[in-house]
Amino acid sequence: MQTKKTKTAIVVAHTHWDREWRYPIWKNRSLLVEFMDWLLEILENDPNYSGFLLDGQTVCIDDYLEIRPENKARIAAQVQAGKLAIGPWYTLPDLFPVAGECLVRNLNRGIRFAKELGGHNPIAYHTFGWGQTAQFPQMYQSLGIDYAVAAKKVSKERAPKCEFMWTSPDGSKLLTSRLGHFTRQNGYFYLHFPVRLNNIYDDNQYAWEWGKTGVAYHRADSKIARNDYFRIDHEDGYFKENVKDAAQRTWDNMDETLVDDYRLLMCGCDFSTPNPYLPKMLADSNEAIDDIEFKMGSLQEYFTELEKRIDRKEVPIVHGELRDGEPCYASANALATRIHIKQLNKHAENVMIRRSEPLAAALSTLGGGFPKSFFQRGWEYLLKAHPHDSINGVTQDKTVDDTLYRLNQAIEIGETLYEDSIATLLKRLDLSGFDPEDQLLLLHNPQPRPVSEVIKVAVDTPQEKNVWAIGVAEADGTPLEVQQISRDEHTQPVHDIEARPWPFSVDRHHVYLQTGTIPAGGYKVVKVTHEANYWREEQWWPSMRKSTADNIGESAHQLENEFLKVVVNPDGTFNLTDKSTGRVIKDMHAIEDEGDTGDYWAYYAPYNNQVISSRGFNSRIWLEDNGPLSASIGIETIMQIPAKAEYGEVKYQGYGKRSQDLVDMKIISKITLNKGDKHLKVHTSINNKAKDHRVRLMIPTDIKTEFSDAAGHFTVDRRGAVHEKDADGKFYPEMALRPMAEFCSV
């Protein structure tokens, strides 16, 4: 007679399907189609296969239906039957490289897409990426989601039990599970591997054996010999003798759960396909173990029952972001990998979120249409650039190219719609106060606050006017300050839908302009004036320029305005003085270079490291664009650094050093100070020819503080200035690398 079951294990079949990680998009798409075809067949034909979690996303359904559009009804049937859990995400982003608005749009798009098929997974499933943002509980609760599964990662010091109340800065709470050992893969590694493969994943015996493990092929072209092997037969093995120990071990690896007799076991892994033997494995587990009932279920089923078994008042509370490390789980190294992707993404976000969409929305309230379909396509390109592997570039070069392509499409769509909105605005303007031949400038302020600043603009005047210098005036004639930079000749096409492009010959004047106040989210119209003319054919007596003698550039190495003073040092660093307080910050903007034998995800210094400072090299320093509104100092430093690192077959095991061969790394910085600004603008570019290293910008503050602050997602993240140490007084230096958005401060 079988003993009555006193414990329950909810086993969730799932996969983690990276859209493009190990393989580029179309190789991955082929594998996805094979996977989805098989999954649908199992769900439709095996009544004991009660459900499958499709990784918390919906873009994989979108991708699949591009190839198999005829299967949309089949997918919808499984979603509506509760057997296929999809969403709430559209794509699976890494959080810290992308804007908070993008996370909200991602969730909204995923939920809408899922609802079209029958409904979305009501659990915040987020086991991907490298760290969780502090405001997730508020974001999820605003969407009606009260439970979460989160990994990568909260420490056991903060959450000694798997379950905790995750609390955001506004006080919103989610009942959350961090899962146990091997997190989302515990059932796959501890149950699937022994029973299906007669193997243990974390054992040294896990290796492919030619002629024994299965049949695999590999392309032998020498140029792609590094490509993976692919198995072409299906695994039919089943080792029932391993069931009891494997099932018990899987159960035991969730021993940190708050409810000892009710546990969540996740049976899936990266790119894992549905296991058709899973119902049999669970039936055999029930037969082999007397007191535990193993049954397939869903995250929703697990949390519904968990809620009944706990007292929320006794559940530990965890505040804020979840990125406690170890470094391989939450290192910021991925944030610094292929930085050009992040830069282009920031530009795309600015165009879509802060400029194009707000103006189009505002104009639509005045009776104009809103280009919804265009914006939907722009957001699709942007969100498809945000999967955690794609946005960080921890992929092959082909995928990097694809990600950049998507970002560029989003930018082009956003810029096009912005120009269309400006054209619509111009048609609506009352310009009766100006003469028909006046040249006008429309100054648009997309920010949610009034601005008055110095900007750099290019203003064209007809060549037949022979304008030597321009001015700019308010609508009432009040002049605005202008600083001339340069002038050149162009012939510019004028697009006309009713004619061929018209050639328009112009003088292009590059100037700095003090805008005067522009209202929040608004605009102003100003007039271009012709301050001086010249004889274009004159060769011997050029028109001379006058100066007000109040230039911001004091010398080739010094800038000063009302609030700040900058002095550049011979080594390329600079000293910054706040004139309102007298405080001086010295030796800013040194460059530090050191070896890195880690990988995409974690920084790892070679054992025999060399740290090289730009302060050991001379710099070339010059002044440019000097005038009363703006001035810039250029700094060029050429550092000699090791060409690469030398290490053994396994980078982390003992041997590693930087090479003796040196290469030049040219660093060019441009420091700009504008009239009236209380901040300094610095643009630095690096021509990198070396490998296996990292480059850091050093900004000493001499401020003693316990905390540092950084812009996060709809909050300011406060973190310890020094990373918290463990009981032995140690910490991982890599975890001192912190993410930031628009700013960081101490």
Positions of the model-derived regions?
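Catalytic and substrate-binding regions of extracellular carbohydrate-active enzymes
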Residues: 190-191, 200-202, 372-376, 384-685, ...
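Short, solvent-exposed turn/loop segments enriched in Gly/Ser/Thr/Pro and often Arg
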Residues: 52-63, 89-92, 124-133, 151-158, ...
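N-terminal catalytic cores of secreted or lumenal carbohydrate-active enzymes
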Residues: 1-97, 101-105, 113-115, 142, ...
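Active-site and substrate-binding clefts of carbohydrate-active enzymes
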Residues: 8-17, 22, 159-432, 444-446, ...
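CE4/NodB-like, metal-dependent polysaccharide N-deacetylase domain
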Residues: 104-142, 233, 249-264
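Hydrophobic faces of well-ordered beta-strands that scaffold small-molecule active sites
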Residues: 11-13, 50-54, 85-88, 122-124, ...
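Acidic (Asp/Glu-rich), glycine- and aromatic
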Residues: 676-718
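Short, surface-exposed basic-aromatic patches at helix termini and helix-loop junctions that form
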Residues: 137-145, 165-169, 282-290, 311-312, ...
